[in-house]
Amino acid sequence: MEYASEKRIESKALPGVWFTIARMSFGRRIELTRRIWELAGKAEYLEAGADVRGRLEAALVAAEIDSVYLRWGLRKIEGLTVDGEQATAELVVTQGPEALCRDVVAAIKAECGLNAAEAKN
């Protein structure tokens, strides 16, 4: 049996762009959980607040969590350059199309086995 530790996916947001993500493993799940543990607790606390500032902070923390997922799971991007440079995970996060970031994060969360409600957080 051959097991591929990565998965190649065509972007729904940008047809013709392909990205490769890490598949979930026991060790990767531990690593990812460690990376998002503190942020996830903070997001949950802030979401419980009723004021606008708390909700804005919760949205910021949720975006930071998505950034962790993206940097953790995105291995390669094909078919995209950003300002003349071959796209990388860091370049896509900082300067790339937001729709692609959302597409990649959704694929990574699906690979992690998160349902829609869990993926939202």
Task: Indicate where each model-derived feature is located.
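Short acidic, Pro/Gly- and aromatic-enriched capping/linker segments at domain boundaries
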Residues: 1-12
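Short, surface-exposed, charged amphipathic helix/loop patches that serve as local interaction elements
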Residues: 17-20, 24-121
